[in-house]
């Protein structure tokens, strides 16, 4: 079950009809159908009775093991006690055809069920809100990005205003990395397969890799940046005095997601990670992880994600993994020790670590009540072992370093999509592609408006001048709809007095403001990366 604004939902209900055996078509199944089953492709929780009912209905074999029902290679977590929730009000959300394999297809009916009608109505209203603020709609409306048919599926084109947002996010992360002592690097995107075989990606991640042959040699686009950073580490002899060595990169990676799973910027095949890799000694792990956890919490708070809206998880060894039990235990204990010393509560996610090491994940809850997994910190003893990394210790002996993988945004594209939906298209001023729009009341004050435009540009403010023939009220509405944080309205009176009228996106309007006072407050708001419109609040 999922939690939504304090209401417990029986969400994600699915009824799967095997077309191969009974020939049903999607349109033949209506709202009256009550045999709902849980999607076997997700890590969905259901009761033991529900699991048995699901498995009994289906013609395929299954078995219960370690609290999971195994079905056709998929696993569903089973609760020990039957649920007391018996939904009375259902709504069909989607009917589609699903092809899990070439010879099998299903009609999949997605729906939700609630005990009370008002809960169902509340949920449907929430769905409308989610749909309205879909980042794909916002991206098109604000001219941020597109997915033309001529590009490969899952690869976005970022327009001028969308690139501004990306650059601001990267600039902020560059400042964070510099404050933590990172060396920014740049690495290639194509590598010989021998690299991926050494790293283990070829055996454990091949299904998501883009591999191809050129001149009788197998090559691959990088799905992760870590092996490339390892090659930089190996390029010279390292001393214990050099450690920790921290590399950062805005690295473009490619992962071959299934076409049906692609979803705007949230699930793409090519994306930029705010990646970082730290090479260090074992006794440096705890302090480094603690610093990373604290810095991640600080960064997320800049975007308004703090307190109960941040959830920290510890993900342990998955079934498909590399390395010995001893190395996994050491890595997991290092993460646990750091979290405990910080006094941070965390949730253990069994078997959800990376194939090379355990990890700390940060989930955030957005303004629409949804949880998103973002930041990650991973301790890795295995890749240094596989690549035979070394450093010279105090006594002259050669020792194996430990490696920490970290990404705070996760990826620029996904984080940008989450922010667009979280802020509903109205980004904080420092992130907004257009920060100020000047609206002259008439053409008589065009010279004054142009003078203000020049001064704002001199101070690196992203500003536009709207001299269109539309009415002032329409131009104000247009600026508001486009998420412009501030409007400067000027008429004859403002020109004569050398002042401006400032109108905020929050509909606060202040007349007779000295331009220099507004500029000073605006620059301070941008410099501090304030969430709220602090500039106009200071002018009140």
UniProtKB/Swiss-Prot annotation:
It is found in: Cytoplasm. Keywords: Aminoacyl-tRNA synthetase, ATP-binding, Cytoplasm, Ligase, Metal-binding, Nucleotide-binding, Protein biosynthesis, RNA-binding, tRNA-binding, Zinc. Binds 1 zinc ion per subunit. Residues 134-428 are annotated as: Catalytic. The keyword Protein biosynthesis applies. Its EC number is 6.1.1.3. One of its GO terms (biological process) is threonyl-tRNA aminoacylation. Zn(2+) binds at residues 226, 277, 405. One of its GO terms (cellular component) is cytoplasm. Its cofactor is Zn(2+). It catalyses: tRNA(Thr) + L-threonine + ATP = L-threonyl-tRNA(Thr) + AMP + diphosphate + H(+). CDD domains: ThrRS_anticodon, ThrRS_core. It holds the Pfam family HGTP_anticodon. It comes from the Archaea. Its main location: cytoplasm. One of its GO terms (molecular function) is ATP binding. It is an enzyme of class 6 (ligase). Belongs to the class-II aminoacyl-tRNA synthetase family. NCBIfam families: thrS. Catalyzes the attachment of threonine to tRNA(Thr) in a two-step reaction: L-threonine is first activated by ATP to form Thr-AMP and then transferred to the acceptor end of tRNA(Thr). Also activates L-serine and transfers it to tRNA(Thr) but cannot deacylate incorrectly charged amino acid; unlike most archaea the editing function is found in a freestanding protein. Homodimer. Probably interacts with its editing subunit. This is Threonine--tRNA ligase catalytic subunit. The lineage of its organism: Archaea, Thermoproteota, Thermoprotei, Sulfolobales, Sulfolobaceae.
């Amino acid at each position: 079950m999922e939690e939504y604004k304090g209401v417990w939902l029986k969400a994600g209900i699915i009824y799967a009809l095997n077309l191969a055996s009974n020939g049903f078509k999607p349109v033949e199944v209506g709202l009256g159908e009550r045999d709902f089953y849980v999607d076997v492709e997700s890590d969905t929780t259901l009761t033991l009775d529900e699991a048995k009912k699901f498995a009994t209905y289906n013609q395929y074999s299954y078995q219960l093991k370690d609290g999971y029902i195994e079905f056709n290679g998929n696993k569903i977590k089973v609760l020990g006690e039957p649920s007391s929730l018996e939904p009375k009000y259902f709504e069909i959300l989607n009917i589609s055809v699903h092809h899990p394999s070439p010879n099998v297809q299903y009609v999949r009916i997605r729906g939700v069920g609630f005990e009370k009608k008002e809960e169902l109505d509340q949920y449907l209203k929430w769905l409308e809100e989610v749909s309205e603020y879909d980042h794909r709609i916002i991206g098109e409306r604000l001219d941020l990005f597109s997915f033309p048919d001529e590009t490969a599926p899952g690869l976005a084109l970022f327009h001028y205003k969308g690139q501004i947002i990306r650059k601001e996010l990267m600039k902020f992360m560059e400042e964070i990395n510099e404050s933590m002592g990172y060396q920014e690097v740049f690495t290639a995107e194509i590598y010989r397969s021998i690299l991926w075989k050494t790293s283990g990606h070829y055996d454990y991640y091949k299904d998501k890799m883009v591999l191809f042959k050129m001149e009788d040699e197998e090559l691959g686009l990088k799905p992760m940046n870590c092996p490339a950073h390892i090659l930089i580490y190996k390029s010279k002899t390292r001393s214990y005095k050099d450690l920790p060595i921290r590399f950062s990169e805005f690295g473009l990676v490619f992962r071959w997601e299934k076409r049906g799973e692609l979803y705007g910027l949230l699930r793409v095949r090519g994306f930029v990670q705010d990646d970082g890799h730290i090479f260090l000694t074992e006794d440096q792990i705890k302090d480094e992880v603690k610093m990373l956890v604290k810095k991640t919490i600080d960064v997320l708070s800049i975007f308004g994600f703090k307190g109960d809206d941040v959830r920290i998880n510890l993900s342990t060894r998955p079934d498909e993994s590399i390395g010995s039990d001893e190395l996994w235990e050491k890595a997991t204990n290092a993460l646990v020790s750091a979290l405990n010393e910080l006094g941070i509560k965390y949730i253990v996610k069994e078997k959800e670590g990376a194939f090379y090491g355990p990890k700390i994940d940060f989930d955030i809850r957005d303004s629409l009540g949804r949880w998103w997994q973002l930041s990650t910190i991973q301790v890795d003893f295995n890749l240094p072992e596989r690549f035979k990394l070394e450093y010279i210790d105090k006594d002259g002996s050669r020792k194996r370093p430990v490696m920490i993988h970290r990404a705070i945004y996760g990826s620029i594209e996904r984080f940008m999509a989450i922010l667009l939906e979280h802020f509903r298209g109205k980004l904080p001023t420092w992130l907004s592609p257009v920060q100020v729009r000047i609206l002259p009341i008439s053409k008589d004050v065009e010279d004054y408006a142009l003078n203000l435009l020049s001064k704002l540009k001199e101070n690196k403010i992203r500003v536009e001048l709207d001299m269109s023939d539309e009415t002032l009220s329409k131009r104000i509405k247009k600026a508001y709809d486009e998420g412009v944080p501030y409007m400067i309205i000027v008429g004859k009176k403002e020109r004569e007095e050398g002042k401006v009228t400032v109108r905020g996106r929050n509909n606060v309007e202040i007349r007779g403001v000295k331009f220099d006072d507004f500029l000073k407050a605006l620059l301070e708001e941008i410099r501090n990366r304030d969430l709220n419109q602090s500039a106009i609040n200071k002018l009140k």
